[in-house]
């Protein structure tokens, strides 16, 4: 949008100003008759992204989604934009809508056959029936129709924010100077000038990816602090959980050992009870949590606020024991290779 249109939209469609397509949806409400229907094809970004939260809430108050087909990024030949086609019933509340999800069929020639297949066979696996009011229970009200029916109620119970605190982050502002791999540093200097450092990385559930160390000398700490780059000093030495901020696949949660520091690329949460951390990690590494995160923020970044908004089941002794076993197994596997500082020999030797 140019400046003139941007200013006009801001004045006339305040809660839809982020995109012209949402402005057109709002305009559709103005043009429709009472209890009329509005049908459009738009980009699908408004369904999930946080900047459209107020727009979604307004839409759900004013209407129900009676049907929707969410197409893949390459749903049309020559177009690389995820789109959605939908019908809104203006003034209706509590209507159960029919949703078809074609995201996994990322070819133009697959869109129509898979949509027709879903209509012929509701048990195909990509057709869902959901009431629009269910979305209001999920933080941010995303149009997450693929979640199990009633799963939004879980967000009304205990959340991760009830047991975890954000531990901040370390920002060196010059990683080339202040970061090293652990094998580049004398072991005599580890724990004094150099501290172990969680720094994001690839996919690894439960444990691992602890390659890095950070300069933690008095001079380095002063430098980080001068740029606002120090973590929560009351929490940073405690054990917790962390994950990689940026991921192109699934988010993986793992242990942040006590006395390990962490970067902004490895968001970290601390609970007052270490058992709560281990138990929560079992849920966070589950397929259900993956579906929740996909609903809350279907982008490449998984932020602290995304995780704090997740539901958190009560601690269960059986789950706790299984989670500890998973951690031990992954740690043993990690220590079987030279990248681990606890490596002794390859298991095949």
Residue positions per predicted region:
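Extended amphipathic alpha-helical segments enriched in small hydrophobics
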Residues: 305-349
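Signature of N6-adenine DNA methyltransferases within the class I
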Residues: 1-188, 209, 223-227, 238, ...
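Ligand-binding pocket scaffold of soluble enzyme catalytic domains
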Residues: 230
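Amphipathic alpha-helical
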Residues: 197, 201-224
């Amino acid at each position: 949008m140019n400046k003139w249109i941007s200013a006009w939209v801001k004045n006339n469609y305040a809660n839809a100003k982020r995109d012209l397509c949402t402005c057109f949806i709002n305009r559709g409400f103005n043009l429709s008759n009472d209890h009329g229907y509005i049908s459009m094809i738009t980009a699908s970004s408004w369904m999930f992204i946080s900047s459209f939260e107020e727009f979604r809430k307004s839409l759900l108050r004013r209407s129900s989604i009676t049907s929707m087909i969410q197409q893949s990024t390459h749903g049309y030949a020559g177009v690389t934009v995820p789109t959605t086609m939908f019908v809104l019933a203006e003034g209706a509340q509590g209507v159960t809508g029919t949703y078809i999800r074609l995201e996994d069929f990322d070819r133009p020639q697959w869109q129509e056959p898979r949509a027709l297949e879903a209509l012929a066979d509701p048990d195909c696996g990509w057709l869902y029936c959901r009431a629009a009011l269910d979305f209001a229970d999920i933080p941010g009200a995303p149009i997450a129709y693929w979640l199990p029916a009633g799963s939004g109620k879980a967000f009304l119970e205990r959340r991760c924010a009830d047991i975890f605190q954000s531990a901040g982050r370390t920002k060196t502002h010059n990683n080339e100077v202040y970061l090293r791999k652990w094998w580049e540093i004398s072991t005599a200097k580890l724990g004094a000038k150099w501290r172990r450092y969680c720094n994001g990385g690839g996919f690894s559930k439960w444990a691992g990816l602890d390659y890095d160390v950070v300069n933690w000398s008095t001079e380095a700490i002063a430098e980080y602090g001068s740029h606002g780059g120090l973590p929560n000093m009351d929490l940073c030495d405690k054990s917790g959980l962390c994950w990689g901020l940026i991921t192109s696949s699934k988010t993986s949660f793992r242990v942040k050992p006590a006395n390990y520091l962490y970067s902004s690329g490895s968001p970290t949460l601390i609970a007052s009870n270490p058992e709560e951390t281990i138990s929560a990690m079992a849920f966070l590494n589950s397929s259900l949590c993956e579906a929740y995160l996909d609903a809350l923020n279907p982008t490449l970044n998984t932020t602290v606020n995304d995780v704090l908004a997740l539901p958190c089941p009560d601690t269960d002794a059986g789950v706790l024991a299984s989670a500890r076993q998973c951690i031990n197994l992954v740690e043993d596997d990690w220590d079987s290779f030279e990248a681990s500082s606890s490596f002794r020999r390859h298991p095949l030797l």
